[in-house]
């Protein structure tokens, strides 16, 4: 039974990977054009210059900086809003939730900020980026990890992660 299950899993993973082959090719070609990877093959003739313009790299860095400033302000990313009657006890509770969540994200979860920063640099390059948030039994707390789009394999035409048949996270 386990052999059949693993065989099915590998077969379906290969189908999902193949369904996004055009996206992967476009993504790696785009990185090459940005100058993130040197490759001689794309030169029009032997000895041609491989110079790329830094404008796109600068745009990526500007996006990262702006998004970081907006999404991770100095007082933390969590905001709360009271739903329904905004009584004093509810407002105080909302304040405590905000304070605790920001404390967890900015102080206890030491990986949160660098992983989020990496995600923001990657996002404009790939067009998609993901965060995997899970409870770590060893650390006894939630952990938030950046998952690059090339490491998250789903059927290419899936409209959202909640309804897709499979989600495969390639862990390197």
Regions found by a protein language model. Name each.
Residues 1-172:
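Extended, helix-rich architectural segments
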């Amino acid at each position: 039974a386990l052999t059949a299950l693993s065989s099915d899993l590998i077969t379906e993973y290969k189908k999902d990977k193949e369904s996004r082959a055009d996206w992967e090719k476009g993504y790696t070609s785009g990185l090459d054009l940005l100058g993130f990877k040197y490759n001689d093959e794309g030169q029009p003739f032997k000895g041609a210059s491989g110079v790329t313009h830094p404008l796109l790299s600068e745009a990526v860095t500007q996006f990262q900086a702006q998004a970081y400033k907006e999404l991770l302000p100095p007082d933390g990313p969590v905001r709360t809003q009271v739903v329904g009657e905004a009584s004093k006890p509810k407002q105080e509770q909302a304040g405590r939730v905000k304070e605790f969540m920001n404390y967890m994200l900015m102080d206890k979860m030491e990986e949160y900020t660098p992983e989020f920063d990496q995600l923001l640099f990657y996002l404009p390059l790939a067009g998609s980026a993901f965060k995997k948030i899970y409870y770590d039994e060893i650390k006894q707390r939630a952990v938030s990890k950046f998952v690059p789009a090339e490491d998250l394999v789903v059927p290419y035409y899936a409209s959202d992660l909640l309804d897709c048949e499979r989600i495969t996270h390639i862990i390197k």
